[in-house]
Structure formats: C-alpha cells, structure tokens
Regions:
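A conserved mid-protein helix/loop that constitutes part of the nucleotide-sugar donor-binding site
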Residues: 1-4, 174, 178-197, 214-217
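N-terminal strand-loop element at the rim of the active site
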Residues: 4-55, 214-215, 340
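Short hydrophobic beta-strand element within catalytic cores of glycosyltransferases
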Residues: 19-20, 263, 272-276, 282
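Acidic anion/phosphate-binding donor-loop and adjacent secondary structure
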Residues: 46-52, 132-137, 146-166, 171-172
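Short His-centered aromatic/hydrophobic patch
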Residues: 72-80, 97
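Nucleotide-activated donor-binding/catalytic signature segment of Leloir-type glycosyltransferases, i.e.
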Residues: 220-235
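Aromatic "clamp/platform" in nucleotide-sugar-dependent glycosyltransferases that forms part
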Residues: 236, 255
Length: 342
C-alpha cells in the first residue's frame, strides 16, 4: 500500500524514506532509490530489546532528517515508533492500523496501544474494524488500500491465455492463487490440506503461492512430503497483477485480516474470491466475487470444486464502478494520504 502511494505522489513536494526490520527484494530497493527515497534497517525489538530498538529508531530519524512526519504501519508495535519519533522532536506522528487482531503478548498489546494513544497525534486505518481494533474509541481516519486499477483489468480470454503461457501455467488446469507472507495467520497449512483433498478427488488444478516469510521453507517442505506438485512456490514477485489476471480463483483462508489489498486487487481483476470468516466484509465489492467460508476443509474443497465447473465473469464496467464508489483507486487513496500529512 505504501509503495502504491509513493509511486503516485508528487515527489518534488514530498519524499518518503523507509525504516524496515528486515531485508526487502533488490527490486524494491532499486525502485525506492530511483524515486529519490532511502531505505534504513533496524532489527526488531524481539532481537535487540525494546530499549535498543527505541535508541536505534531515534538515531535513524535524527541522523537522516529532518523529517516532517513519521508514519508507522506496524500495528501495535507502532507505539514504540511513535515514542521514538516524539523523543526525536517529530511534530506529526501517524499510527496506521492494518489488522483487526494482534498476535503479540497481552502486555505488549497494552503497552503499544498506550504509547499510540499518548504519542500518536494522527491515527489512520485501512478499514473501520482495523481502526477500532487498535485505536478503540479514539478518532481515526479510514483510507482504503488503493491500487493502480489499470494493472488488473482483463479485457478478454486471449489475454488470460497469453499470461498463462508467460507464467508457465497449465492452460487446461483450474488456476488458484494466494498472495501473502508465509506467517501463521495466513494459514498456508490449511491451503495444503485443501490441495491434498482436491488432488485425491482428481481435480485438474494448480495453486500458486506468492510471497515469502519465516514459514516459507517449512511450508515448502510440507508440500514436498505431501507430494503436492500442483502447489507452486514463487516467492516474492513484482508482477502479482499478472498472476491474478491469469487465475480462476483467489483464496484467502487467513485466521484474521485487516483489509487486505490483495483481495481488492483480485476483485479488480474480476477473479472469484473465497475467503475465511476472519476477513472483514467491508472488503467485498458486492459483485458476487467474494464469498466468506468457515475454516472447515471439507467446505472449502466442495466450494472450490463447484467453482471449477462454474466459471463466471463480471462485466468490467461493473468492476470499475465498484472501485470508484469504494475509494480503492490509488489516486484517490494517495490524495487522502497527502491530506493526512498536511
């Protein structure tokens, strides 16, 4: 979401620098540098302790500024960033919520929320539920996770076939796509269990897993042990839009979510989306593309098999109208974000 906004803004008036806790792909580093920004790294509080983390964040801010604002997207952990920014004399301190639940320990959640309440002077969320989860009754602004909609439109089936050849997808197979980091909340083990049942039922399919993360190797090994050659691991890719446009189905069986931008992207591509009950309904375009299911394997297997035999396309004009009406166009999101900084 941040990169989408960064690409849209007038960078002669406003520049972004990025502070991360782990290495990103070289492609992103090169793009940020080309756009005039910088990327800095600070190890997580879990690795170096809270005191050292605050000290290091403060040092990055003070040694590379001056900055007009610090904008944190770390959910509960934004509290430490807000405190560090306050110590560094930053006048505008923005906490941004992207999730409806948090996996941190109870003391960490209490500390983070308290620091945000005291030291963040602007609060933003991707949706109402995500905002209430982090900020409670405090006032916050909602800015949808906008996308560059033109990248996701599919005008004809010939385009889809061309993309499948380019991406080495089987032309005759039902193509399923998932986008997300390999972390517990994304529920990749559930995806493998569903894939095994589809294979046992002789369904002609492929599953494409896009993303990386701490559980990547473990999930990859599990797929090998389950002989799931139908499951393809692509790592982090820059052409997510092409995989979505080439797919028949997008799945998101997360244990919980904020308002996932990948779900917005998938609907923008006109792809049927099966999601868990942990995904907020406000992510639905109301075009019949999104369907929420309980996290029960048999239900998912049955529903996917039904999707295989009943492929339905939504008119592009209806998709475009839904995107505009819900404020998911990146230009509108970028403008709203700029208003936060002013």
């Amino acid at each position: 979401m941040v990169m989408n906004v960064y690409r849209q803004i007038d960078r002669s008036d406003l520049q972004f620098d990025f502070l991360l806790k782990e290495k990103v792909d070289d492609g992103y580093e090169q793009e940020v540098k080309a756009l005039g920004g910088h990327i800095f790294y600070v190890e997580s509080p879990k690795k170096i302790g809270v005191k050292n983390y605050i000290k290091n964040v403060k040092a990055v801010i003070e040694q590379n500024g001056p900055y007009c604002a610090v904008h944190s997207h770390m959910n509960v952990m934004s509290g430490l960033i807000m405190f560090s920014a306050w110590l560094s004399g930053i006048n505008l301190r923005i906490s941004h919520s992207h999730s409806t639940r948090f996996t941190n320990s109870f003391p960490t959640i209490i500390l983070g929320k308290t620091l945000i309440k005291i030291f963040a002077n602007k609060k933003v969320a991707c949706g109402q539920k995500a905002g209430k989860a982090l900020f409670g009754q405090s006032k916050f602004s909602v800015i949808p996770n906008g996308i560059d909609t033109a990248k996701y439109y599919v005008y004809d089936e010939n385009t889809r076939s061309i993309l499948r050849r380019k991406l080495n997808m089987k032309l005759d197979a039902f193509q399923i796509c998932h986008v997300g980091r390999f972390v517990d909340v994304k529920n990749h083990k559930f995806i493998l269990e569903v894939a095994r049942e589809l294979k046992n039922d002789n369904v002609n399919f492929q599953v494409h897993l896009l993303g990386d993360g701490e559980l990547f190797d473990e999930i990859h090994q599990m797929a090998n042990e389950m002989n799931l050659e139908e499951v393809c691991f692509h790592g982090s890719v820059e052409n997510v839009n092409e995989y979505l446009k080439a797919s028949d189905l997008f799945i998101l069986p997360s244990k919980y979510e904020g308002l996932p931008v990948t779900l917005v992207e998938a609907q923008s591509a006109g792809v049927k989306c099966l999601v868990s009950n942990g995904v907020p309904t406000e992510a639905d375009f109301n075009l019949g593309l999104m369907e929420a299911l309980p996290l029960e394997k048999d239900i998912w297997v049955t529903r996917i098999k039904q999707c295989v035999s009943n492929k339905k396309r939504i008119a592009q004009s209806d998709i475009e109208s839904a995107i505009r009406n819900r404020g998911y166009d990146i230009k509108e999101s970028a403008n709203k974000m700029l208003e936060v900084y002013l």
